Amino acid sequence: MCGGRGGIWLALAAALLHVSLQGEFQRRLYKELVKNYNPLERPVANDSQPLTVYFSLSLLQIMDVDEKNQVLTTNIWLQMSWTDHYLQWNMSEYPGVKNVRFPDGQIWKPDILLYNSADERFDATFHTNVLVNASGHCQYLPPGIFKSSCYIDVRWFPFDVQQCKLKFGSWSYGGWSLDLQMQEADISSYIPNGEWDLMGIPGKRNEKFYECCKEPYPDVTYTVTMRRRTLYYGLNLLIPCVLISALALLVFLLPADSGEKISLGITVLLSLTVFMLLVAEIMPATSDSVPLIAQYFASTMIIVGLSVVVTVIVLRYHHHDPDGGKMPKWTRIILLNWCAWFLRMKRPGEDKVRPACQHKPRRCSLASVELSAGAGPPTSNGNLLYIGFRGLEGMHCAPTPDSGVVCGRLACSPTHDEHLMHGAHPSDGDPDLAKILEEVRYIANRFRCQDESEVICSEWKFAACVVDRLCLMAFSVFTIICTIGILMSAPNFVEAVSKDFA
C-alpha cells in the first residue's frame, strides 16, 4: 500500500521536474541564441556565399479591382523560408525544444517588398513572429492586404480578361548576397469573388541588371489572371441597351400624323446617353483603347441619331405644301418606282381607282356642249338655272387618253378650258346661259386644282411612307449587325455567355 503511494508521488515529481527543466531549457536556449546576435548581419557561414531565400504566397481573396484608379486589392499570405547559420542548436542539449519564435526586429529577415505597391504605407504586411527550428530553418509568414498597381485593359469590357502582376524582391540585397528562389503560389484557400473568376496565378523568377552594378537583382513575379463575370453588366447595361435600340426602330412604325416621331427618337437618344455616362464612370480616363461596350453604345447612338434625321425628312415629305411644287422627277423615279417596287408597296387605292379609270376613260368637256339658238324659243319657269341646265342637256363625255381625267367627276383639261374661255361663246341672244357656263367653268377649274393638289399631297405622303419602310429595314439590319458584330468580337464572348448566363 505504501509502496504504491510512493510510486505515484515519484511519477508526479518526475513530471513536474520535466516541465520545469523544459521551461528552463527553452529560456536558456533563447539566451544562447540571441547572445552576440546582430540582426543586421547576414546569417551565413561564408560571407562570399549568397543566402538562399525561398519565396511563395497564398492568395486568399481578390477584394477589389479599381478600374478607374487601376489598383488591385488582394488578401495574401506571404511565405518566406531560409536557413540562419547562427540559430542552430542540438536538441539533445535542449530536450523538448523543437522550435522557437522570434519577434520582428530581433533576428535577421529578408527585406522583401512588393515593388508595384500602391499602398500609402508601401509595406502593407503585418509583421508576425519568425518560426525557427533546431536546424536553423526559419519560416516567416506575414499576412497583408496588398494594393498593387495594375494596368487595366478595358478593350473588351465587359468580356475582358485582366492580368495583374505582383512583383516581389529584396529592396537592398543583390543577387550575390541574397538568392531569391520562387515556389508555386497556393490557391487552395481562395475565396471566390462575385465579379471575377480566378483563372490562375503563375509565377516567374526574373533577374534584372542595372548600370550601377554588375550583380543581378532577382525578383519573383506572380501574374494574377482573372476573367470578369459578365452577368451583372449584361443585365444592367447590355440588355437595356439592346431593348432601347430596338425601341428606336419603332420611330419608323409610328404614323407621321401622331406628332410623336421626333419625341420618341430624342427620348431614346437621351436614354442611351445616360447609359453611356454610367459606363464612363466605371472606366478609367484613358485613350489607349475604347471599351467594347462603349463602341456598342456609340454605334447605337449614331443609328438613333440618324433615325432622328431621317424622321425629320419623313415629316417634311408628309406635310409638304402642294403649293411648294411638284415632286422632282428623280425623286419620283427612285422612291415611288424603284424603292416602292423593292419594298412591295402600292399607293393607297391604286388597285381600286386605276381599273375603273381604264374601263371608263371618259372626259367631259365644255367644248362638247352644243348650244342651239334655233331650236325654239327658250322657255322659262322663273329660275335662271333652269335655263342653264336646259342648255347643258346636250353635254356629253367623249373617251380620251388624257391622264388628267378624274373618274367619277366632271373635269376639263386646261387646253379645252382655255379654248372655251377665249374662243367659245354662246349665242348673242342668251346672256343667262353665258353666265351659267362661266360658273360651270369656274367650278370645274376649282375641282381640277383640288385634284391636282390631292395628287401632289398623296405623292409626297406615299414617298414619306416609302422612306419610313426603307429606313426600318435598313436600320434593323444595321442594328443586328452592330449588336452581333461588336459584342461577338470579344475573344472570350462564347465562354463568358456559356458560363455566366447558363
From Swiss-Prot:
Subcellular location: Postsynaptic cell membrane; Cell membrane
Effect the entry attributes to changing N445A: Slightly impairs dependency on RIC3 for functional expression
Database matches in PROSITE patterns: NEUROTR_ION_CHANNEL (PS00236)
Membrane-related topology note: Multi-pass membrane protein
Matches recorded under CDD domains: LGIC_ECD_nAChR_A7, LGIC_TM_cation
Residues holding Ca(2+): R42, V44, S172, Y210
First-listed, main subcellular location of the protein, grouped into a coarse class: membrane
Residues covered by region (Essential for TMEM35A/NACHO-mediated proper subunit assembly and trafficking to cell membrane): 260-267
UniProt note on tissues of expression: Expressed in neurons. Expressed in umbrella cells of urothelium (at protein level).
One GO CC annotation: dendritic shaft
PTM field: Glycosylations at Asn-46, Asn-90 and Asn-133 are essential for TMEM35A/NACHO-mediated proper subunit assembly and trafficking to the cell membrane.
Membrane-spanning intervals of the chain: 234-254, 262-282, 295-315, 470-490
Signal sequence annotation: 1-22
Effect in UniProt of substituting L433A: Abolishes dependency on RIC3 for functional expression
PANTHER family assigned: NEUROTRANSMITTER GATED ION CHANNEL
Family named by the database record: Belongs to the ligand-gated ion channel (TC 1.A.9) family. Acetylcholine receptor (TC 1.A.9.1) subfamily. Alpha-7/CHRNA7 sub-subfamily.
Name of this chain's protein: Neuronal acetylcholine receptor subunit alpha-7
Organism: Rattus norvegicus (Rat)
Record lineage: Eukaryota, Metazoa, Chordata, Craniata, Vertebrata
Gene name for this UniProt entry: Chrna7
